[in-house]
Amino acid sequence: MKLHKKKLTLFAFFILTVLTVTLKTYFSYYVDFSLGVKGLVQNLILLMNPYSLIALVLSIFLFFKGKKAFWFIFIGGFILTFLLYANVVYFRFFSDFLTFSTLNQAGNVESMGGAVTASFKWYDFVYFIDTIIYLFVLIFKQKWLDKRVFSKKFVPVVMAASIALFFLNLAFAESDRPELLTRTFDHKYLVKYLGPYNFTVYDGVKTIQNNQQKALANEDDLTKVLNYTKQKQTEPNKEYFGAAKKKNIIKIHLESFQTFLINKKVNGEEVTPFLNKLSTGNEGYRYYPNFYHQTGQGKTSDSEFTMDNSLFGLPQGSAYSLKGDNTYQSLPAILDQQQGYTSSVMHGDYKTFWNRDQVYKHFGIDKFYDATYYDMSEDNIENLGLKDKEFFKESADYLAKEKQPFYNHLITLTNHYPFTVSPEDASIEKPNTGDSTVDGYIQTARYLDESLEEFVNELKKKGLYDDSVIMIYGDHYGISENHNKAMEKLLGEDITPAKFNDLNRTGFWLKIPGKEGTVDKTYAGQADVMPTILHLMGIDTKNYLMMGTDLLSKDHNDTVPFRNGDFVTKDYKYVNGRIYDNKNNEPMTEKPKDFEKRKQQSEKDLQMSDDVLNGDLLRFYDNPDFDKIKPSEYEYKTGPKGQERK
């Protein structure tokens, strides 16, 4: 018995392996992964999240007997270690985590051999020191092992405890980051809250689901959608068709902007004086006050997706995250193939957020200027990333060097929840609603307005303003229904369901060189932007699959569907199962004659778009006007040295 006490039991070896793999995971969190951990709750989650899957996987091998059990636990621990280390090396180079989608592109590693080698660090032995020790014991010191059968009645207890710990971890994660699994944020979020091993399981489940949906799809499904979208198409306005052919296109994303801010005064001051000027129709802009966002859970990523593809985001999660590997016929790619445009995106956040570094390759976007191209010193950072003024200042310099004609998309950040701005950047007093979110929103919106004005002035100085098509739009609402009481104080009116629907107007400003501005009260949404731009460029759209219609067309369809099933028209809105008159936002006593037709169309638009995404239907489409995008031809390098198409 004394001899047995000195030996290493199977359960002790199990505990040791769980602890060492967990410790290595902690080491990676703080040394190699940049997870942006803040506060007590997130640190507690970080301590918790590796254990559950490590213990659950390794506990399975406790059912085995003798030497086999030791070896299986060792192999299990080694596989987990290898997965961790593979993520470490991948993260050092790509600032992202391995997914099953990226493993399908493993052939690219051969061409990056030098870069992968450069990703090795001197301290990497830490990840394998326990593996070496365990291997030495298993081969040369078997006499140290107690090979007696482990009592299997304890194994279910260990497994149950592991599963319970996972759900506790998930509960903490959901409390700190609601809708974590359904909205599928940046992979860093998922790893921070779930750990690298649970993230791999999650990614595997999502991959299987996506593959199953794709596997069932066929060309007949595509034909149904094409037949539907072709009968939706409208004739272009002759006055505008080709009016901006081969003009530079600058698309400016106003983060979380809502049109109630236009002409709004707080303490006697205009919140957005510059945008107010652009909204008069006297500054060369067509202003669309009845332009709505059509995003779902993907929010910003959905707005990008919808405007560049004229498809809707998914009912759950982000299309960028879940359908990023699909085949697309995007606006920037069409402009490239039809008129030789180069395309770029500029954003003061890191390229992996919302899976942009992968999605943009499938959109055929040539260049991506992410945070690594900007001065990200502490003084220039606010909230999620680079301050808008610094972002626009540096972006203008990059833009001046772009090959023309170009299609450029600039994504701002400062006017983002929780709407904080440093005292030196706050140029308007907060209102006094008692809600820090609503009060802060006024200050960050003013800062955004000032930033935009400075950028426009820079464009004028660089000779890029007058002869460019300029689009300005709000991507999604900033103030949710949770802040209705404060909004009632700010606006001086009740926030009914109909009024909240009105607050989903995010605005669209369109400057067309050589054309006068106006206030256009047409009802429209983000899906309508792509066909509008293509017609302005003089591009025939009959062979492109799009859910929206040309804003400038006399036959524009003014039914605006929303991802939650609501919709709005120029006369009425359908919200939460009730119909409201747009004139007074009062419930309508009689159903409009065209209501059922509009409702069915709205539902079908969403369903057809979902079918395209879930079945990856565009892979079947041999469009005579479009060559399929080859994602492997695009690579987005880390700044500031620039990036070029291969």
UniProtKB/Swiss-Prot annotation:
The protein's enzyme class: transferase
Residue ranges crossing the lipid bilayer per the database entry: 8-28, 44-64, 69-89, 120-140, 154-174
Cellular location(s): Cell membrane
Topological domain spans for side Extracellular: 29-43, 90-119, 175-646
Main subcellular location of this protein, as a coarse class: membrane
Residue ranges, annotated region (Disordered): 579-646
One BP annotation, GO: cell wall organization
CDD domains, sorted: LTA_synthase
Residue positions binding Mn(2+): 255, 300, 475-476
Molecular function GO labels: metal ion binding; transferase activity
SUPFAM superfamilies from the UniProt entry: Alkaline phosphatase-like
Site features described as Cleavage, chain residue numbers: 217-218
Keywords attached to this entry: Cell membrane, Cell wall biogenesis/degradation, Manganese, Membrane, Metal-binding, Secreted, Transferase, Transmembrane, Transmembrane helix
GO cellular component: extracellular region; plasma membrane
Composition-biased stretches (Basic and acidic residues): 580-607, 625-646
Top-level division of the source organism's lineage: Bacteria
Active site (UniProt): 300
Signal peptide: none
UniProt keyword Cell wall biogenesis/degradation, yes or no: yes
Cytoplasmic face residues: 1-7, 65-68, 141-153
EC number: 2.7.8.-
Function: Catalyzes the polymerization of lipoteichoic acid (LTA) polyglycerol phosphate, a reaction that presumably uses phosphatidylglycerol (PG) as substrate. Is required for staphylococcal growth and cell division process.
Family per similarity comment: Belongs to the LTA synthase family.
PANTHER family to which the protein is assigned, alphabetical: LIPOTEICHOIC ACID SYNTHASE, PHOSPHOGLYCEROL TRANSFERASE I
Annotated protein name in UniProt: Lipoteichoic acid synthase
Source organism of this protein record: Staphylococcus saprophyticus subsp. saprophyticus (strain ATCC 15305 / DSM 20229 / NCIMB 8711 / NCTC 7292 / S-41)
Lineage: Bacteria, Bacillati, Bacillota, Bacilli, Bacillales
